[in-house]
Structure formats: C-alpha cells, structure tokens
Amino acid sequence: MKKVEKKDNFKKFKNDNIYKKDDKNINQELINEEKKIKNFNSSNNESSNEKKILFDIEMNITVELGKSKVKIKDLLNFSKGSMLFLQRKKEDPLKVFANNKLIALGEIVFSNNKYGIRIISINNSLNGINTSV
C-alpha cells in the first residue's frame, strides 16, 4: 500500500464547466418555480385557512459559500491546516436556497458574534407570491 504524504498546500482547481452548467439548471428551476407560484396564487381552491397553515411550515435555509472539485487522492491528503480553494470570488454574491431551491443572492455579514446574510436580490419567482390570507 502506498504511503500518503500530508500536504498543506493545494492548487486552486479550475472548473469553468460548473458555472455554465449550474446557470442553465438555475434558470430552468426558476422558470418552473415561477409557474408553480402563479398557479398557487391564481387557484380559487386555496382557502384562507389552508394558506395560513402553509405559511407556518418551516423550511431549511442554506447559504452556499462556494464549490470545488478535488480528486480523491487530494481529498485523502487533507489534514488540519489544509486549504481548499473555492471557485467563488470574494466579491461574488452567495446563493441562498430554501429547501434546495435558489431563492436569493446575498452577502455575508457579522453581527452580535454571529454570521448572517444580507439579501441583495430576490428571485423574481418569490416577488409574485401573494402572502395575504
């Protein structure tokens, strides 16, 4: 069996394909979500009570800091202090997801010893939601 050496310096991995592929998928997801929201808002079958129940459901919110692809051999070399460089640049907005659906873009903030996200744009599909009950 080959001995694995520990490395603390990793190359920045280039992957131009991910952004192009993700952008297409994101746009299609947004179009599908927008259609669902229009159907939901125009539906006469939804009563006020049903909407109240729906709006009280909790959702998981995830903020994506970035992505990277590494070879398994590089992953096995990870150790304390190893660095993994992401494709995201410092000035790029973070993607905000609700139950794995892209809902907004934001920037990282720090307040009261906690990280947070300041929303800088909301996807058009969310702007059309009728929240009145």
Curated annotation (Swiss-Prot):
It holds the Pfam family FliMN_C. It is a peripheral membrane protein. One of its GO terms (molecular function) is cytoskeletal motor activity. It comes from the Bacteria. Keywords: Bacterial flagellum, Cell membrane, Chemotaxis, Flagellar rotation, Membrane. Transmembrane segments: none annotated. It is found in: Cell membrane; Bacterial flagellum basal body. Coiled coil: none annotated. One of its GO terms (biological process) is bacterial-type flagellum-dependent cell motility. The keyword Cell inner membrane does not apply. GO terms for cellular component: bacterial-type flagellum basal body; plasma membrane. InterPro entries: FliN-like_C (IPR001543), FliN/MopA/SpaO (IPR051469), FliN_T3SS_HrcQb (IPR001172), SpoA-like_sf (IPR036429). FliN is one of three proteins (FliG, FliN, FliM) that form the rotor-mounted switch complex (C ring), located at the base of the basal body. This complex interacts with the CheY and CheZ chemotaxis proteins, in addition to contacting components of the motor that determine the direction of flagellar rotation. Belongs to the FliN/MopA/SpaO family. This is Flagellar motor switch protein FliN. It comes from Buchnera aphidicola subsp. Schizaphis graminum (strain Sg). The lineage of its organism: Bacteria, Pseudomonadati, Pseudomonadota, Gammaproteobacteria, Enterobacterales.
